[in-house]
C-alpha cells in the first residue's frame, strides 16, 4: 500500500544548544500532529547578546502521515 506524507517547517529554540532546539521543535509539533515520522534540521542559527550566545535556533522540516478516509 502506498502512503503519502506532508512536510511542515517549524523553528525550535533553546538556551541549551542546537540538539535541544531541534527536540523542542519536534516535541511541540507532535502535540498537534498525528503520525510524525521524521525530522530534518534544515538550518541552525543563534541569538547573540554582549558577545555570548543566548538562544540556539533550528529550522526543522517535520514529516507526518496524511490520513486517508478510504
Short names for language-model regions:
Residues 1-2, 62:
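Short N-terminal signal/transit or membrane-insertion segments
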Residues 2-37:
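Short, well-ordered alpha-helical segments
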Residues 4-7, 42, 70:
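N-terminal presequence-like segments and the immediate start of the first folded domain
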Residues 5, 36-39, 53-59:
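Short connector loops at helix/strand junctions that flank enzyme active sites
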Residues 8-10, 44, 58-64:
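A structural signal for short, well-ordered beta-strand segments
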Residues 17, 46, 65-69:
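Generic "edge-of-domain/loop-turn" microfeature
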Residues 39-48:
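Short, conserved loop-to-beta-strand elements that form functional interface hotspots
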Residues 51-70:
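C-terminal structural segments of small proteins and small subunits
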